[in-house]
């Protein structure tokens, strides 16, 4: 049974960040492509490096207060209890990708407040 475009878009809208990440990986493997954007070669003189604007929030460890960390992870990602627990149990894992620096720092502080170790990349 074939899905129409609207059904596919609706499914993508309802998916979590982790589910979308898995989808991208599956598409890359199935079709032998990569989701990475092509990189432009810099001129010999070299332009000034652009300041990074998109950051990834990575949960490196849960610490001693795992239940509190799971609650904050659920709040940040919108995941269900089971998915959030699996994410916390299998660190390091990305929580949010391509977010602004301010949001990344705010979420990092919130997670560190409950004892998690977090990296902003």
UniProtKB/Swiss-Prot annotation:
GO terms for molecular function: mRNA binding; structural constituent of ribosome. Coiled coil: none annotated. Keywords: Ribonucleoprotein, Ribosomal protein. Homodimer. Part of the ribosomal stalk of the 50S ribosomal subunit. Forms a multimeric L10(L12)X complex, where L10 forms an elongated spine to which 2 to 4 L12 dimers bind in a sequential fashion. Binds GTP-bound translation factors. Forms part of the ribosomal stalk which helps the ribosome interact with GTP-bound translation factors. Is thus essential for accurate translation. NCBIfam families: L12. Belongs to the bacterial ribosomal protein bL12 family. This is Large ribosomal subunit protein bL12. The lineage of its organism: Bacteria, Bacillati, Bacillota, Bacilli, Bacillales. The gene is rplL.
